[in-house]
A protein has these predicted regions:
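N-terminal Rossmann NAD(P)H-binding glycine-rich loop of SDR-like oxidoreductase domains
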Residues: 1-24
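NAD(P)H-binding glycine-rich loop region in Rossmannoid oxidoreductase-like domains
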Residues: 36, 43-83
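Glycine-rich NAD(P)-binding loop of the Rossmann-fold in SDR/ketoreductase-type enzymes
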Residues: 50, 79-90, 98, 109, ...
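Catalytic helix-loop patch of NAD(P)-dependent Rossmann-fold dehydrogenases
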Residues: 82, 116-155
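Conserved Rossmann-fold NAD(P)-dependent oxidoreductase catalytic core, especially the SDR/UDP-sugar
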Residues: 90-128
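Flexible, glycine-rich beta-alpha linker
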Residues: 128, 153-173
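Alpha-helical substrate-binding/gating segment
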Residues: 159-166, 176-198, 205
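Conserved C-terminal active-site "lid" loop/helix of NAD(P)H-dependent oxidoreductases
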Residues: 198-199, 205-223, 238-258
């Protein structure tokens, strides 16, 4: 099985690759700059998401793409448009042209960040993005729906919560995704049979979880193990945010919380 990562040298990709090292015989990395420290079975390709022809070539004979590339925080709309919207289209279109079986799209909780924090939601609610970044993730999920329905591409959208070694604040007692759970989640997203089209919250087994995730967990055969509640004493006295997206909902927010 050949697996390809976009953005594989970033913060999330580096952890995932280390946790899954040696599991797949061929791993291709699309990176912006040369010099990635390669692990077992990995090959580095330098380029970006703007080059559809290059992406199509790199996708040849690939079974699954883990799409982590793009901007990972709020930025101006022109930058989000170029990197996260056009870039994601190029990735899905390259996958279609190259007959890739499955795309795992790194979506985000910021696609639904304007839901109140006192409301538990599932994977069927309408998007309520809290930022241009969140809009780009809602777009990617919808684009994946089109590529699944129209061309049969299997798509797993992972609405990643707060990817950290440990929670940073009271909000993350609800949204935390541990490194261990992230690795097992992506492993199941790659290996689970016949997933069709799925939206799965990338969140650990947190007592204060805001997201009903049973359908996605069942579809992938995934079981998160960690619980942010073990860190709760560190944030005693902190008040949860009004909205699930936290600081991203601020009209003046331009990035920096990721």
């Amino acid at each position: 099985m050949a697996v390809m990562y976009t953005g594989g040298a970033g913060r999330v990709g580096t952890v995932l690759r280390a946790g899954l090292e040696g599991r797949y015989p061929e791993v291709r990395l699309l990176v912006m700059e040369p010099g990635t420290e390669l692990l077992t079975g990995e090959t580095e390709f330098v380029g970006d998401l703007s080059n559809l022809d290059l992406l199509t070539e790199l996708c040849s004979d690939v079974d699954t793409i883990v799409h982590l590339g793009g901007i990972a925080d709020e930025r101006s709309f022109p930058l989000i448009l170029e990197n996260n919207i056009v870039g994601t289209y190029n990735l899905f279109e390259a996958a279609r042209r190259a007959n890739v079986r499955r795309v795992i799209f790194a979506s985000s909780n910021h696609a639904i960040g304007f839901y109140p924090s006192d409301t538990k939601i599932d994977n069927e609610v309408l998007p309520r993005p809290d930022s241009y970044y969140g809009v780009s993730k809602a777009f990617g999920e919808t684009l994946g729906r089109l590529y699944h329905d129209k061309w049969g591409l299997e798509v797993v959208n992972l609405r990643i919560g707060s990817f950290r070694e440990a929670p940073d604040d009271v909000r993350q007692l609800s949204t935390w995704l541990s490194h261990r759970d992230a690795i097992s989640l992506v492993q199941r997203a790659i290996e689970a049979p016949g997933v069709g089209y799925q939206i799965v919250y990338g969140v650990s087994a947190n007592t204060r979880n805001w997201w009903e995730n049973e359908a996605g967990i069942k579809a992938l055969g995934w079981q998160p193990l960690d619980n942010a509640e073990s860190f709760a004493d560190q944030f005693a006295g902190q008040t949860p945010p009004e909205y699930q997206g936290g600081g991203y909902v601020d009209p003046d927010y331009t990035g920096g919380l990721w």
